[in-house]
Amino acid sequence: MEENNKATSRNGHELKDMYDPETNTLDIRSNGLYPSNVLSNLCSNGFRFEGMICGSMEGFLQSLKRQDINKQRQICSMKGGNARKMSVTSWQTDQIVWWKGQAIDRQSDEYQDLIHRAYKAMFEQSERFRAALMQTRGMVLTHSTGEDNSFKTILTPTELCGILMELRDSYDKRDKTQELIEKSVAIEQENLDSEKPTARKIVYVDMGGVLMDFHAGLELI
């Protein structure tokens, strides 16, 4: 069954408004009102990524902690709540995570590139997630309940919010660029139309038994 992410309560508990108008910030929380809850990694925004079925972003992130590819595939397909229960801390010792059999340093640029690609895939494939993110235009995104130490978590609040705002602003810029292109094309077409010669009405007159264009006849005089 599809989740009603715009509901005001869940399991008898009221969802909270996570937007602060004074600071113009939106706190990303699974128990927040829309769009805060849909932006949570626990939300079931399913997508495919590099051959893997991801039931949620939480599923993808938790799967990175497992070297066994079959276990990784299983966790990757899970919805958020179930995936979070599969969390382990063994990766913290050497800071190595895994993706499809490849070892990756958690603190490396390679890892940052991986999670950026995953979020981009979810953004492109999940209309629900994309719509929720674009509704936050102009807001600063935060995640107050996350762990800030990157050596202890698979994703910090800074990483999460940075990726989401980058996706949002890039998409918004692309939309505006396309709008400007379309306007430019329309204006150019209008200019071309205005430069077209006006069709002249041809009037024929009898010139000694020969029909002649009246305007052409005037030019001969």
PLM regions with names:
Residues 2-191:
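Charged, low-complexity intrinsically disordered segments
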Residues 183-205:
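Non-catalytic pre-domain segments flanking phosphatase-related domains
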Residues 198-221:
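Active-site neighborhood of HAD-like aspartate-dependent phosphohydrolases
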